[in-house]
Amino acid sequence: MAGPPRLLLLPLLLALARGLPGALAAQEVQQSPHCTTVPVGASVNITCSTSGGLRGIYLRQLGPQPQDIIYYEDGVVPTTDRRFRGRIDFSGSQDNLTITMHRLQLSDTGTYTCQAITEVNVYGSGTLVLVTEEQSQGWHRCSDAPPRASALPAPPTGSALPDPQTASALPDPPAASALPAALAVISFLLGLGLGVACVLARTQIKKLCSWRDKNSAACVVYEDMSHSRCNTLSSPNQYQ
């Protein structure tokens, strides 16, 4: 009787397997633009479009320490990071949301990506925002390729380039004169270790002999030999 139910489950599993790629594709996030260059004080629009079941959407600024800029959910008051408070506007719904960032500063330069909150988190391709000074706006060009997560540029500043004279004035590496001092320290540590070993050996011998007959000749000879050996190691060199 167990055979027919198993055979009925097989077509159901195959149907689920066929529908899984379509469900994952439906959760893809479309983001535009890929790159934009704006002067200081201007605004930029970032659009996040997705289809399928969606709980909400984040806009994150990538970098060494990713930062959530906004969180938007239909019917809920949007959450905005303190740095962008009063500079963010929304239009549309969470399925097709346009985020407008106003009064951009040089420190706002970075890569921003849409993160759709679904059964599995899905990310957009990212938008590279280059905020430049007005006189240098023509120096920066955007490519049509989506930005990479690691392509976070630093805010353009004129003082970022090192002074050639300062760069050539780096301190030289330490000379080899530190080698004798290192050898002296190593020799001192070796001598200290040998002294501690001799003290421990004599202590162990005394404990061993106390367990045996104290009149035993073997213990007396062994202890005398250990004592003479430690004295030989600790005696100074007459030829130095």
Curated annotation (Swiss-Prot):
Q: Where are the transmembrane segments?
A: 181-201
Q: Which residues form the Ig-like domain?
A: 26-130
Q: Which organism is it from?
A: Homo sapiens
Task: Describe the subunit structure.
Answer: Interacts with SECTM1.
Q: Give residues with lipid attachment (S-palmitoyl cysteine).
A: C198
Arranged from A to Z, the UniProt key words for this protein are:
Adaptive immunity, Disulfide bond, Glycoprotein, Immunity, Immunoglobulin domain, Lipoprotein, Membrane, Palmitate, Receptor, Repeat, Signal, Transmembrane, Transmembrane helix
Give the signal peptide range: 1-25
Can you supply a Gene Ontology BP term from the record? T cell activation
Q: Which Gene3D superfamilies does this one have?
A: Immunoglobulins
List, alphabetically, the InterPro entries matched.
CD7 (IPR039090), Ig-like_dom (IPR007110), Ig-like_dom_sf (IPR036179), Ig-like_fold (IPR013783), Ig_sub (IPR003599), Ig_V-set (IPR013106)
Could you name the domain of life of the organism this protein comes from?
Eukaryota
Q: What does this protein do?
A: Transmembrane glycoprotein expressed by T-cells and natural killer (NK) cells and their precursors. Plays a costimulatory role in T-cell activation upon binding to its ligand K12/SECTM1. In turn, mediates the production of cytokines such as IL-2. On resting NK-cells, CD7 activation results in a significant induction of interferon-gamma levels.
One of the record's GO cellular component terms: membrane
Q: Where in the cell is it found?
A: Membrane
The cross-references to Pfam families, in alphabetical order and at most eight, read: V-set (PF07686)
Please identify the protein, giving its name as recorded.
T-cell antigen CD7
Q: In which tissues is it expressed?
A: Expressed on T-cells and natural killer (NK) cells and their precursors.
Q: Which SUPFAM superfamilies match?
A: Immunoglobulin
Extracellular compartment residues: 26-180
Residues bearing attached sugar chains per UniProt: N45, N96
Q: Where is this region: 4 X 9 AA tandem repeats, potential spacer function?
A: 145-180
Sequence ranges of the sequence repeats:
145-153, 154-162, 163-171, 172-180
Q: Where is this region: Disordered?
A: 140-172
Q: Does the keyword Transmembrane apply?
A: yes
Q: How does it sit in the membrane?
A: Single-pass type I membrane protein
